[in-house]
Every structure is written in structure tokens, then in C-alpha cells.
């Protein structure tokens, strides 16, 4: 089962986790690949530079009343308080999320914009294709994307369990491995 509902009450999350003992369940408040890659990149940047000020700006259509589930997902992933989320409501914006890292003399901005709702369909297709390869359990998009992004974080699936990669994904993985090597040197590793 793949769910992209923005927010569940805690009681329903507990129920999904209980059901996951008998089936495979993936829940993500935002199922797009881009937003989930951005979250992984943001977690990496926060790990490298934990001293930065971090703010989240989310933009949606004029009539959306609540803070987006995606902004809350980003906030939780980065272990930030809800006060770090700023909301803008205007026109027919499908969804824009920006994570701003404030360094003393510069900023780094990671931004994702959904320009078509097809992005959600592509993400759902990827989620289903990856989920069927897993054991019964409760999964996130981060866990499905982890093998394609960075394999040094213990909460992600081991690289040995990663699915076979297409040429494009192999190129992306090589770039990521190069980035990981650079990070390891930066952090004093091998």
C-alpha cells in the first residue's frame, strides 16, 4: 500500500504501523521524487553544517488553509520546530518548498517546485516499484530513495539491497559516490 496523504492523526499512523506487520506500507506526505531528494540533500547539509540557521518557506494556492504536510515532513526530517516554517498563499500555486540555510556570510537555498501534478504520479509509480521489492514493514520515500542518494547513513537500506540501476541512475549514483568521497575527506575520513 502506498499513501501520499499529507497528514494522518497519530492514531492512524499507529494503525498503519501495526498493519505493516502483515503487508508492505509506504507513507509519505509528499510522494514526488524531487522533494524527497531535496530532504535527503538538506539532511546531508545539516549534518555537515549543524550550526546554520534553517528556515522553511512553503507556497501553495490561495485557499489552502493549513501548513502543508510536506513542510511539516521537512521540518521533522531536519528536527526543526514548527516556528521555522513560513507559509505563503497566493493564486493557484501547486506547491513550492524552499529550505534556507543561513551561514554567517552566505546562504544556501534548496528549492523544489511542483509545476505539474504529474510529478506526484511519477513518485507514486516509483514508490510502488520499490515497495514490492521490500519485506513487510512501514517505509518512507527516504528509505526507497536512500540507495540512489547516499549509502553511508545507517537508517537507509544497505547498498547491497539496492535495486538494479538504469544507466541514468548509475550515472547519478557515481556522482553521488564522488560527492560522498568529498564529504568523507571533508569530515576527516578516508
Question: What residue ranges belong to the model's regions?
Answer:
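Rossmann-fold NAD(P)-binding glycine/threonine-rich loop
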Residues: 5-25, 36, 44
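Short, ordered loop/turn segments at secondary-structure junctions
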Residues: 5-8, 30-32, 59-61
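C-terminal substrate-binding/catalytic lobe of Rossmann-fold NAD(P)-dependent oxidoreductases
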Residues: 50-159
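Glycine/charged-rich beta-loop-alpha catalytic/anionic-binding loops adjacent to active sites
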Residues: 18-27, 103-110
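Rossmann-like NAD(P)H-binding beta-loop-alpha module
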Residues: 37-51
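Long, low-complexity, intrinsically disordered segments
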Residues: 168-190
